[in-house]
Amino acid sequence: MIWPFKTSTRKKIARIEVTGAIASGTRKAVLKALKTVEEKKYPALLVRIDSPGGTVVDSQEIYTKLKQLSEKIKVVASFGNISASGGVYIAMGCPHIMANSGTITGSIGVILRGNNLERLLEKVGVSFKVIKSGPYKDILSFDRELLPEEQSILQALIDDSYGQFVSTVAAGRNLAVEKVKEFADGRIFTGQQALELGLVDRLGTEEDARQWAATLAGLDPDKVELDTIEDPKPLVRRLTGGDSQLQTMADNLGLTESLKWCEFELSTSGQPLWLYR
């Protein structure tokens, strides 16, 4: 028999996870989950963040949606082991932030990395012929040194992205821009230090964050249920075909996280990153 009545979500708290490096796959999964939260009219959302950050635009889009959603329902962010760089950025879309005292956070800044293999290519006798429409079309090419004027162009790009980051943190935490710049130099700090700097509101566990979200929504913290909105299958599950034994083996060997990181590195090469390395 099919039960004819739908379970109400108005007395439940939605929960989503943002884990690992933030890239396009993360953005798609999180935005899909946030759409579900909005459509099902949950009164509150708990966002569990355990991420070193990632790509700029993907972080910005998650932040924007969280900020929009926070105008309709109560949204609480809970920092796990690490919530750094882009992980901090997306949390700025949440009016209420809780971290563990030992959480690694901060790393507010931008990094852009390129590799120069010119000498190696010379040793193996490999060279490239490049035809380009402008002098900077092959900027950050791996077969030659970066020119001083190219470095200036990239530094301007980094500085602009950094300014966006600082402004968002200042607005999200109600701090002066100059105050944020005092600690937004790429350094990392603990959750305890983040509390002292005004980057988070409280210290506590994810369970504490759940109870906080319930209270904000006017629900009984001891009775309210938590609905975790699942994300699509990650790469390793697609490769194992969903086989639980293969999945467990991959997890035990550390292949799951390694594949995630390889996928991220391949998809973000040459991009500015809000990432703690």
Swiss-Prot record:
Answer whether the UniProt record assigns the keyword tRNA-binding to this protein.
no
Catalytic machinery residues: S85, K137
UniProtKB keywords: Hydrolase, Protease, Serine protease
Q: Does the keyword Hydrolase apply?
A: yes
TM segments? none
What Enzyme Commission number(s) does the record list for this chain?
A: 3.4.21.-
What the entry lists under InterPro entries is as follows: ClpP/crotonase-like_dom_sf (IPR029045), Pept_S49_SppA (IPR004635), Peptidase_S49 (IPR002142), S49_SppA_C (IPR047272)
Q: Which BP terms from GO are recorded?
A: proteolysis
| Sample GO molecular function, one term | serine-type peptidase activity
Cross-referenced Gene3D superfamilies: 2-enoyl-CoA Hydratase, Chain A, domain 1 (3.90.226.10)
Similarity field = Belongs to the peptidase S49 family.
Indicate what this protein is called per its UniProt record: Putative protease slr0021
